[in-house]
Amino acid sequence: MAQTERYKKWRQTPKGRETRNAVQKRYFQRMDPTNRKLKHIQGKWGSHVPLWYIQRFEAQKGRCVCEKELIFGATDVKSDQTCIDHDPQFSREQIKKSGKTNNPIYPRQLLCNMCNKGLGMFFDNPDLMRKHADNLENLKG
């Protein structure tokens, strides 16, 4: 049995899985937060999105639509994370696979966690958002 096959079998055992996970965790913790974020984006969104992320961050001047400052690198605080907003007609998997074609699909913009959740709650529906905004204005008197 070849060494790589033995290693693959060993990784399937509880001890092997635990050891490999610990090694991977140490590797990512030692990485620079910026590189860690870009590597995470590449794995989640595809190889064409990290460059888009850098360009979009610069185009938005490091700010969300709500003017909150965005964090470029990785952060352990979930509420501080910069979110990638995409058109709901395309899943993350479709965007990822499109990077291997001549016509890649890119996300829409970068948002703070709060704005990303808000858009999701309103199903990316501007009319619904306007109704609620108008309602809030009316409640203020």
Predicted features and spans:
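Contiguous alpha-helical segments
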Residues: 1-83, 88-106, 110-141
